[in-house]
């Protein structure tokens, strides 16, 4: 390692052929880093590989699946919303750029996971502008509220399905009919997600309380296996965005 090169964004990638010990290496790394005060957050465990490790450390994983009580809101603000009423304009804009940027990345991935035949649903500058305007209205950022309101993906879908005159104007559409015609694919994709892969899992405010002082916390996705790879992939996308928000 070169001491003259600062590490500002440390990441580790573990990859290899099946059965070569990737999971075992990761678990060993996790355990050893605990001696140095590091804690671990498993953002989606599709096969419950980390459950035995959690059990040894006295931690019960959060189980996410159809019919289970756990909900995760991928549009949660996280710590960046704390003390919003005390921020000056520059800091508020900087934090908003981070939060809305994270949400747009999430929704771009979710909408793009839906298909029309073999073609992914597009999420270009027009769709991004509509979604961003909708999120800003729902949270109160558009009106400069001192306390922002946490929203959800279903709430965004409902707003786009029944747009307010303000939203139509901000998105530069001639009329509500024009707005609805031009955003049909976007709205249908969000509607399909809301009633399908996200339903009962990522469609409401977060209902779990993470113990950040625990040595490890894990979110189990093994109950999603019968739903197929697409459902697991969407869940991992949502958890990645939520986890990023909790750490920002």
Language model features with spans:
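Glycine-rich phosphate-binding loop of nucleotide-binding enzymes
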Residues: 1-66
């Amino acid at each position: 390692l070169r001491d003259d090169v600062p590490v500002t964004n440390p990441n580790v990638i573990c990859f290899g052929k099946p059965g070569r010990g990737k999971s075992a290496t990761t678990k060993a790394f996790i355990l050893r880093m605990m001696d140095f005060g590091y804690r671990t957050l498993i953002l989606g465990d599709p096969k419950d590989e980390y459950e035995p490790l959690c059990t040894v450390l006295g931690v019960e994983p959060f189980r996410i699946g159809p019919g289970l009580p756990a909900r995760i809101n991928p549009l949660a603000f996280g710590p960046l919303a704390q003390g919003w009423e005390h921020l000056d304009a520059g800091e508020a804009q900087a934090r908003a750029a981070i939060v809305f940027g994270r949400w747009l990345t999430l929704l771009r991935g979710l909408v793009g996971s839906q298909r029309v035949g073999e073609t992914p649903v597009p999420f270009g500058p027009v769709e991004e502008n509509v979604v961003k305007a909708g999120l800003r209205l729902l949270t109160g950022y558009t009106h400069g509220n001192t306390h922002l309101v946490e929203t959800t993906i279903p709430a965004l879908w409902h707003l786009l399905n029944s747009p307010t005159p303000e939203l139509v104007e901000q998105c530069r559409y001639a009329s509500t009919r024009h707005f609805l015609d031009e955003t049909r694919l976007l709205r249908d994709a969000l509607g399909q997600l809301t009633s399908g892969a996200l339903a009962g899992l990522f469609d409401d405010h977060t209902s779990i309380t993470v113990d950040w002082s625990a040595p490890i916390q894990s979110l189990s996705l093994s109950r999603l296996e019968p739903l197929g790879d697409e459902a697991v992939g969407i869940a991992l996308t949502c958890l990645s965005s939520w986890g990023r928000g909790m750490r920002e």
